[in-house]
Amino acid sequence: MGKWEINDYSEAVKWLKTKSFIDSTKIGITGGSYGGYVTCMALTLGADYFTHGLAEYSVTDWGLYDNVYTERYMDLPAENKEGYKFGSAMTHAKDYKGLLRITHGTLDDNVHMQNTLQLIDKFTSMNKHFELMLYPNERHGVGFPKWVHAQTEYVRFWYKNFLGKDFVNE
């Protein structure tokens, strides 16, 4: 997983960059769960195309995810070592540039927080800048009332990085 998704998104970004109204220094992507995985891969494997990402409760290594789901698409790890390696954001972390904000609930029982911890460990070992927001006692997604904070910070991220403005929270 990861190869064709990033190929498709990168081709779309190449096309967008041909448009005069596109600022190629501000190409963002966001998603949660599998979308968070794609976001992490876009800022690593696709780092030449994407400048900003907001990844929520993301799979970063398919070896850490539910084997019933993963093996349906990737076969057994022993039968597809290269696929599992290529599909891990950790494999491409060396190519990371831009700005990635990672969010995760500490009680996520779907995509375990170990995914986030391994990626940020890799980034910090390489002295890469990123942003991290953890939500204590939240699961796979942030529920109310913390959802209000999560959404406010989500909007603040885009205001600051794409509009160069502070988001006024009233």
Regions found by a protein language model. Give the residues of each.
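Active-site-proximal cap/loop segments of hydrolase catalytic domains
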Residues: 1-170
